[in-house]
Amino acid sequence: MKKNIFTLLILVGICLGMTSCELFGLSYAYSFKNEPGKDFDTLNCNAYEFIESRADNDLTLMYEAINRAGLKDLFEAEDYTYFILKNDQWDDYMSTAKYSCIQDIPVSELRTYILGYIVHGKYTSKDVTNPIYLESMNGVQIMRMYKTQTAPTSSQNLNSLVAGWVNPDGGVYQRGCITSNLVCTNGVVHILSSRLIIVV
């Protein structure tokens, strides 16, 4: 009897946890019928709380970078779209820039870099039927976003978002999102497949 009650409590806890940020898993949003992109259910947390909930998992360095740059308030502010980097993408950035850890990056550089991944307004894949160009929050990068409309492969989500910074020559070195349309209480989060790059 005790074993059955214990099992039932575990199952109830898992079900409740699935709606929280703490146990929310990043999933792939495939649509094989070229249907309009769909939003995930609104998460019961803001973008900062979502990242904080994964600080012990795949968003450790993103969480550290936001706090070191003093940008927590922006990730709690209303009406923004955030492109998020996982740990391996931060490792790639630090390796390229010759930093050994987040704490080595000058705060001003870190702020500029993170702000380049944020645009004002809430954009999901169904809001971007044609490519759009938006100024990033750092006032330097222009971001081009569009929705994938080709047949999916093992590494591509149909109707997911694709983004990139516009290079000085007008070209865009674009990156897909491994997860799109995570609608938080204050904006939209997209998880990039790799970091954005500008060619100078």
Where are these regions (language model features)?
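Bacterial Sec-dependent N-terminal signal peptides
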Residues: K2-N4, C15-F50
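Hydrophobic helical h-region of N-terminal Sec-dependent signal peptides
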Residues: I10-I14
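Post-signal-peptide N-terminal segment of Sec-exported extracytoplasmic proteins
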Residues: F40-D79
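Soluble non-cytosolic domains of exported or imported proteins
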Residues: E52-T60, I84, D104-E109
